[in-house]
A protein has these predicted regions:
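Catalytic-loop motifs flanking and including active-site residues across diverse enzymes
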Residues: 21, 159, 163, 217-221, ...
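A conserved short coil-to-beta-strand element within the FAD-binding core of flavoproteins
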Residues: 35-55
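Single conserved hydrophobic/aromatic residue that forms the stacking wall/gate
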Residues: 1-7, 11-12
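Domain-scale recognition of functional cores that engage charged ligands
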Residues: 15-20, 26
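C-terminal lid/capping helical subdomain adjacent to the catalytic/cofactor pocket in oxidative enzymes
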Residues: 201-206, 210-274
Length: 274
């Protein structure tokens, strides 16, 4: 980590990997394709139901009927009855600071925005972001395995204390900075590290379970699902179809205790990177 870039002297090596946010990508595609398709937000699919030779996708306030479905919902594939007892639902946790003042930004120094990922996957990911809501720092660490796909506010708050410590270790000059937001986000893994890909029912194509590498593997799975749905022969489809199916997990009590014990052990091995 370059001190002149991020304002912290905790690490000495870094790798920068800029990326576009998916929302900007979707907006750009929508604007450049006129009325060829529509994007619906705040309309979660809560049920998929067979409707003659089509599928009906129900939302809280309406429904969509379609011939084909590309299902890119990661772990929530299990919520629709697919890959049952074969997907591991893992949460990671994050905190975001309040808007940094001019004085705090001066103390921090470094570039206007940056992102740092750890060499150990259990370590802390740290980002400095800037936008209409000001300059802020986001820190993400800690992991849990939760088959219910839900975590409590208490859990988020508890791990928030760990993020406060990680933040203070990296930025002692910002001891007066407070966190404004805390949250948990889902990851989906499989026991044998393979995707949940393919035609899972007639004309339902899954591009799920990215095993923690959503930007790369999710993009490939999405392209592959489109190729599969349009009967396009491609190297991506052939590669994705070459994987075994996700392995069945042990019974819940065993998988829950075992997975969380392994996570805890790996977090301990992360040392100062956490």
């Amino acid at each position: 980590m370059n001190p002149s870039l991020v304002g912290s002297e905790m690490c000495i090596r870094d790798r920068l990997q800029p990326a576009l946010y998916i929302s900007k990508l979707a907006n750009g595609i929508s604007q450049s394709n006129g009325n060829k398709f529509s994007i619906y937000e705040h309309s979660p699919a809560i049920e998929i139901k067979k409707n003659n030779d089509s599928w009906e996708i129900k939302t809280p306030t309406g429904s969509v009927i379609t011939k084909k479905i590309i299902m890119a919902v990661n772990g929530h594939a299990e919520s629709f009855g697919f890959f049952e007892k074969r997907l591991m639902h893992v949460f990671t946790y994050a905190s975001m600071t309040k808007k940094l003042t001019k004085d705090q930004l001066t103390k921090l120094g470094g570039e206007k925005k940056w992102g740092v990922t750890p060499s150990n996957p259990m370590g802390s990911t740290v980002r400095k972001i800037t936008g209409i809501n000001g300059d802020r720092i986001v820190i993400r660490n800690r992991w849990t395995f939760d088959p219910s796909m839900e975590v409590s506010e208490r859990r988020v708050s508890k791990f928030g204390n760990d993020q406060d410590k990680s933040f203070n270790d990296r930025f002692p000059m910002l001891s007066d900075v407070e966190m404004e937001y805390r949250w948990a986000g889902r990851l989906c893994l499989s026991l044998n590290s393979v995707p949940a890909f393919g035609e899972v029912d007639k004309n339902i194509f899954s591009a799920c379970c990215q095993n923690g590498i959503g930007t790369a593997k999710g993009t490939l799975a999405g392209i592959g699902a489109v190729d599969l749905a349009t009967n396009t022969d491609s190297a991506i489809v052939n590669d994705m179809k070459s994987y075994d199916a996700p392995k069945k997990l042990p019974p819940k009590p065993i998988s829950y205790l075992g997975a969380n014990a392994i996570i805890k052990w790996r977090e301990l091995k992360a040392g100062k990177e956490l």
